[in-house]
């Protein structure tokens, strides 16, 4: 009888911890990682319109500052992407999210990234991603009240996974898969006016300013941010 009670209490305790882990997410950087993040030599200056101007000693420092500024502006969307990359969308979005989790596994995204990560990415690119991840992780460490799920820390491999998974979607892979599994007839040419409307504001604008037209005589390139992605 005592053993049964002990097992029951242990089970209740385990379930309680599991539920707390899901519904009360938190993230604390180790002292070593916190020290590394805070040693970054970067300045984030926001102008009159709130646009961040980032100055870093190295490209990796600038990537760190960019990630922190991104997190300040839209940590919610960044988390949605991280949750997707970590194959936890089902916990946040239910059935629809679980489909995404399955699709990542079915396409062997992690397997592909693990196979080519070391050989296909230069040290410089890896340093950029490390800096960017540090920026996101520091923001998460400082803003636990904004965390949706326990998906931190973010690692450089996670960034690559996101690119490998999402890039084919730009070319219509998601629509082809939907048509395949739902046995729908493949639509003919689709006009922009008939495309499915997104519930979020959409913007996909990029433009450049030549030295002849800029005030300081320098070329300027505005990032195509693909909102809400």
Question: Model-flagged regions — what are they?
Answer:
Residues 1-2:
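N-terminal hydrophobic targeting signals that begin at the initiator methionine
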Residues 5-20:
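Hydrophobic membrane-insertion alpha-helices, especially the h-region
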Residues 17-228:
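Substrate-recognition/specificity elements adjacent to catalytic centers across diverse enzyme folds
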